[in-house]
Amino acid sequence: MYFELAKRNLKRNLLRSILALLGIIIGVAAISSLGILGGGLKQGIMENLGSISNYIIVFPNYQNGYTSFDKRDIEKLRVLNCKVIPVYATSDFVYIKGKNRKAYANIFGIDKNDIKYLNLKVKVSDTSVAVDTFFSNVNDVNVGNQLEIKNISLRICGIYNSTFLFPDNSLILTAKTYRRFYGENNYNYSRIILYVKNINDIDKIKNETDKILNRKEKKCIIISLNSILEAINGVITKVSYFLMGIGAISLLVAGIGIGNVMLMSVVERTTEIGVMRSIGASKKDIIILFLYEALILGVIGSLIGAFLSLFFGYLIVHYLLKTSLSYYAIFYMIIGIIFGILTSLISALYPAYKASKLDPIKSLRNE
């Protein structure tokens, strides 16, 4: 009964109801879309950087005069429950055969048995070199092309994606090949990468590394990539909630619109309310009737707004961020729907209460 009466009353002033409905749709779409956008950003970061969360990078502390690590430092770290990967690094010009030009690049040297732990999906031999996507695109080279370093030719054996471990414009050689170019007796490493199989041991390994290498003085800087990811995700989460809060302002405006519609309805339906009260309708019945009207507006507007947010969220995440919708999209849609319905009901409380307080005799006398 309540539902049918509420539906009839909303149809009576259809244009006014549609305008109130639009406010809810826009508000819910804004809240959900901004939440989905934040979720998409986190998803994109995890897709691009999640593969490096198991790594710790150890750099020399240049401020204290340390520029490299030696064999003794490496051996000290072998006791840790992780894979210790010493890395050579320098910058130099390489000659691109067939292009008749040189290119400047960051060159890394890693033991060929350690490369498999770096999730680069390349296999490098002592006669080959791997290049990152940036170097490949800028210099128009691909697998099979030849690079020349120190007048020695190396075949490009693979292309890997740049990460925090190996930034843009980089090449990877085996440690043996690197020493061939930059000193056979060169065992001074520019950095150390620690691969921790169990991500839950990251903090423990980081602390143990600090105790081993920084026991006497600050010899190195230790960076946990997992902690960087957590910090980035934390910032994005806070920004997402802030943006959702801004979106909630439009929902507040929509709530005011619904309250206004309901108050006007009370004035217009004074006689009708008086008739209902005179034939036995209680104050509770009047309140429930108005809340049903608000509920219908809230449910319809929230559902439309939520699905619009899913549509626009997909377009933004897929085409702009180049990633996929996360499972959080449903969560933000539900949050938007709940807020939309609650806003509608809360906005109708005062008009419903005012309608229930109308004196039936005075209402009929006005007619």
Curated annotation (Swiss-Prot):
Keywords: Cell membrane, Membrane, Transmembrane, Transmembrane helix, Transport. GO terms for molecular function: transmembrane transporter activity. It comes from the Archaea. It is found in: Cell membrane. InterPro entries: ABC3_permease_C, MacB_PCD, Macrolide_Exporter_MacB. The keyword Ribosomal protein does not apply. It is a multi-pass membrane protein. Pfam families: FtsX, MacB_PCD. The chain crosses the membrane at residues 18-38, 239-259, 296-316, 329-349. The keyword Transmembrane applies. Its main location: membrane. GO terms for cellular component: plasma membrane. Belongs to the ABC-4 integral membrane protein family. This is Uncharacterized ABC transporter permease MJ0797. It comes from Methanocaldococcus jannaschii (strain ATCC 43067 / DSM 2661 / JAL-1 / JCM 10045 / NBRC 100440).
